Amino acid sequence: MPPALAVPQAPVLLPIDDVAAISWQGSAGAQSYIVERAEKKNGPWTEIGRNVCDAAVPYRPLFADADVQIAGQYFYRVTAQNSSGASGPSNTVGPVAVRHFTLVDEMRDFSLLHQHTGVTPETGKTRNAKEDMDRMKGAAGAALVYRLPAAIRTCTVYTFFAEEPADLRFQVSADGQTWQTAEARRKDFYSGEGQYGYWKPVRYEAKPQALQSRFIRIEFTGEAQISRIEITYGGAE
């Protein structure tokens, strides 16, 4: 029989500016991680994430804490685990102030969407998508709609295009019935297809001008694959 795995060393939690963007340096031999939160540096600690995989979202924050309160301040720590046991906890990071809520959709399924039309989950060709394993694929006319419990502040969309980019179109609404256009800034990150045939990565950032917009509609104008969406909402400016 192969020897048992060694219990992993404690991971190193990285500085945290936003509770929706928590990352750490992983431990050799770790199979998953436990994320904990506290309101005081020395606890008591509450488990907020179990069996978190640090390979599930390459090149992105590993964990988003969605169960927080505006103006709250929190401390975080992480534990590595495998079949042989768990490490001690990482270093503690905090306090981290909560300025707004954030919905993070990694495009694994439709569970966070209010409505969707003409889109399908895509998991193939990860090398072309720079190892992104979960994306939402659509063509002209396809759309995603999100409904938030408070006014939307910003919407950031990470997208891949196999051909020339066909810009996404953004609309916002207070009631889900009457819509108005939300302008978006576009930033391209393409530096060539390289030896792996990389697609063209583009990031869009939309900020609704209409106050109290709780719905946002993201429409495809051509073939594209959305890899991640971050929507901030609530809180004060």
What are these regions (language model features)?
Residues P2-G29, I70, G85-R99:
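Pro/Thr/Ser/Gly-rich low-complexity, intrinsically disordered linker/stalk tracts
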Residues A30-R50:
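Extracellular low-complexity, O-glycosylation-prone stalks/linkers
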Residues D65-G85:
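Beta-strand-rich modules
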Residues G94-E122:
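Extracellular carbohydrate-recognition regions
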Residues A38, Q171-S173:
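Conserved Ser/Thr-centered positions that define the repeating blades of beta-propeller domains
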Residues M1, C155, T221-E237:
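Exposed low-complexity, polar/acidic, P/S/T/G-rich flexible segments that act as propeptides
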Residues A80, I218-F220:
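Conserved structural position at the C-terminal beta-strand
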Residues N128-T154, E164-P165, P201:
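Short beta-strands within extracellular/lumenal beta-sheet-rich domains
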